[in-house]
Regions:
Chain A
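Cytosolic-side transmembrane-helix boundaries in multi-pass membrane proteins
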Residues: 112, 171-185, 255-282
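Alpha-helical transmembrane segments within multi-pass membrane transporters and channels
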Residues: 24, 57-101, 108, 240-245
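Single transmembrane alpha-helix segments in multi-pass membrane proteins
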Residues: 2-54, 83-89, 229-235
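Transmembrane alpha-helical segments of polytopic membrane transport and secretion proteins
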Residues: 1-2, 78-88, 276-282
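Helix-loop-helix "hairpin" substructures at the membrane interface of multi-pass membrane proteins
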Residues: 13, 19, 131-211, 235-241
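Inter-helical junctions in multi-pass inner-membrane proteins, predominant
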Residues: 1-16, 157, 161, 190-227, ...
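Transmembrane helix-bundle core of multi-pass membrane transporters
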Residues: 85-159, 186-189, 251, 256-257
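Pore- or pathway-lining transmembrane helices of multi-pass membrane proteins that form conduits
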Residues: 40-44, 51, 86-110, 216-228, ...
């Protein structure tokens, strides 16, 4: 019984990690940009949800569509910024911009919302009972959201012309360009999409998460773990890797001491890196 | 013409000696508040120099340098509290420990690949993994950390000084030593090896440079450079905790200072540290010490640097100096500025390479 509960919690938590990881795998695979601020945008989404719920007293999900639009616009701006720095200074320029954005967002959140952890407690969305565990409605919504978005991205990448173009760029940008794919546009789309996805994922999980200003760094590491385990540019691999990390994390919390819950995932990443190095030069 | 001792230009050494002497006496004349800021700046400059040493010579973007500072601090406090080992001795022991701990980290990052981004992520993971490990080791005090056992009448060997001035002077001396070392390294055979590896791993392997060994050696030396800072800082703050060195902001502040200073010149990290710590302190004071203003200032300055001068203050200086020299019709006498990215190097790359080659064989 206890095991089933842990598995359930793990899958629900892992679903969100999958979503964050899918974005990161797109941005590295297609955009060829290691966006260090990827996790920070999850944090922005989380605090946006907190602000809506806490200050405005609304259900964070009400502002889902406007938030998506705003994140897409911001994402496009950031994509332009990466493109510009990449052209001028190369990969290091992009790395610097990502790192700078990560620190800036951490700093702004810390000044704006205080350095202490906060939770959103006044949002009630009902709950369901599965396998003897009470699961809050928000977590169900988050899982459904992940499922829908994950399936949508899969269909988009496999079925549409745009998706095929993105996959071609991930595979080989030079050849894709020769075949008429507008590589810079494809890369901007990947960066924009990943940032929008990260922000919205943050908004979706805000009702049941603990928010700290530097939570973005943790999400960056998880996203990195997802691409290391799932493979760069492999969205299906990213989904499974996210679920795996969620379940392992949940089991570690259930059965092992607290040291292992923080250390375990990091050791898994390092082990994976040593056994199977990342094939792409990033 | 510039005379050289062991490959170091005499004029640069004289300038350093003058700066050291001036700094030494200036520190004695400053108020306690300014000294406290300078202690922090000069302390941060050391791990930042260690980062720039790695990044400038090998192009390795390591976020793990703060780990080696923590290793130094824990080594010092543990040895002093348990065995009564003098911190002065720890200054020599800590680099050895840091080097040993750097070995597997270096192996992991060399094994994983050569990409700067990948190395950055791996070293970030390592620095996030170290605090839980430190906290789990019971003799190291867990989450509370270790406190230096203070004495009522400390002798010189206990390295417990009442005022910050002595610590600031110690950090100053450490910084100068590191600058001298880096100047020597850049001119030495090793310096040419690692720069060759950075610019073209395949070509340097083909001409017989032991690329893997040089990478690991450079990584280990960088770790050893960072460790003494931890020893002195632990004595200054009389404690060592994982959070002090590896907390969310402390970890990134080192990187920000290093990148603001730039890796093009050995003095980059010191200048970067003094500028940014001073600005952050001033901003924090202006906001009446509101929490988070200091780190936010770091971040804001970093954003400006990342967008406006990606090679940092010293990189921009080097660029201007070379331009001036070229305008005067001279040759490029300065060691080639470690460009942020090999592909993005200036067009007159051949001039750089030619100078390098001449010095290496001569």
């Amino acid at each position: 019984m206890y095991l089933e509960q842990l598995l359930l919690v793990g899958v629900l938590g892992g679903a969100v990690l999958s979503l964050v990881g899918v974005g990161f795998t797109l941005v590295i695979g297609v955009g060829k940009v290691a966006n260090f601020a990827h996790g920070a945008f999850v944090a922005v989404g989380m605090y946006l949800g907190y602000w809506i719920g806490h200050t405005l007293g609304l259900n964070p999900y009400v502002l889902f569509v406007p938030a998506l639009l705003v994140f897409t616009l911001i994402g496009w701006g950031i994509a332009e910024l990466f493109e510009w720095r990449g052209r001028k200074v190369g990969a290091i320029g992009e790395l610097l911009v990502g790192l700078a954005l990560l620190l800036l967002i951490n700093g702004l959140l810390s000044v704006g919302f205080g350095p202490n952890p906060v939770t959103l407690s006044n949002v009630e969305m009902g709950s369901v009972s599965v396998a003897g565990t009470r699961i809050p409605g928000s977590e169900i919504y988050a899982a459904v959201f992940t499922l829908v978005v994950g399936a949508g991205i899969y269909v988009f990448l496999r079925g549409s012309r745009w998706g095929r173009a993105l996959r071609a760029v991930a595979e080989n940008p030079q050849s894709a360009a020769l075949y008429g794919v507008r590589v810079p546009i494809a890369q901007r789309v990947a960066v924009t999409g990943s940032i929008a996805l990260a922000g919205i994922a943050g908004l979706v999980i805000s009702p049941f998460s603990v928010l700290t200003p530097d939570v973005g760094t943790n999400f960056l590491i998880t996203a990195f773990a997802v691409i290391v385990i799932g493979g760069v540019g492999n969205t299906v691999g990213a989904v499974f890797a996210g679920l795996l990390i969620g379940v392992v994390d949940s089991l570690a919390i259930g059965y092992l001491s607290t040291v292992w819950t923080t250390l375990g995932p990091l050791l898994i990443i390092l082990a994976f890196l040593l056994i199977r190095p990342v094939p792409v030069e990033i | 013409m510039n005379t050289r001792i062991f490959g170091l230009s005499v004029s640069a050494l004289v300038a350093l000696a003058v700066a050291l002497a001036a700094g030494w006496f200036l520190l004695g004349a400053l108020g306690a508040g300014t000294v406290a800021v300078l202690v922090l700046a000069l302390y941060y400059a050391i791990p930042a120099a260690s980062f720039n040493f790695l990044f400038g010579s090998l192009g390795v973007f390591s976020l793990a340098q703060a780990v080696f500072v923590a290793v130094g601090a824990y080594t010092d406090v543990y040895l002093y509290n348990v065995y009564g080992v003098s911190p002065w001795l720890s200054l020599l022991i800590a680099p050895v420990f840091a080097g040993i701990i750097a070995l597997p980290i270096a192996l992991a990052s060399v094994r994983a690949g050569t990409g700067a981004v990948l190395t950055a992520l791996i070293t970030l993971i390592i620095s996030e993994a170290i605090p839980p490990i430190l906290i789990a080791i019971k003799p190291l005090g867990g989450a509370i950390g270790l406190y230096v056992k203070t004495k009522a009448n400390p002798s010189f060997w206990d390295m417990q000084f009442g005022s910050g001035v002595s610590f600031a002077r110690m950090f100053l001396v450490l910084n100068v030593l590191i600058i001298v070392f880096m100047m020597w390294w850049n001119r030495s055979r090793f310096g040419f090896f690692v720069r060759a590896i950075r610019d073209s791993p395949d070509a340097s392997a083909a001409v017989g440079i032991p690329t893997a060994r040089m990478r690991i050696l450079t990584f280990v030396i960088a770790a050893a450079l960072a460790a003494p800072a931890g020893v002195v800082f632990a004595q200054y703050s009389l404690e060592t905790t994982a959070d002090l060195f590896l907390g969310g902001t402390a970890l990134f502040e080192v990187i920000v200072i290093a990148l603001v200073g730039g890796a093009a010149r050995a003095w980059g990290s010191v200048v970067g540290a003094v500028v940014i710590v001073y600005v952050a302190n001033a901003m924090s004071n202006a906001a009446n010490g509101a929490p988070g203003i200091g780190p936010l200032t770091f971040a804001a300055v970093f954003v400006v640097i990342a967008v406006a001068m990606p090679r940092g203050l010293s990189g921009t200086w080097a660029l201007l100096a070379d331009r001036r020299r070229r305008a005067a019709g001279g040759t490029l006498a300065s060691p080639p500025a470690p460009a942020a990215e090999p592909e993005a190097r200036p067009v007159d790359d051949h001039a750089h390479r030619a100078t390098e080659h001449d010095v290496a064989s001569g």
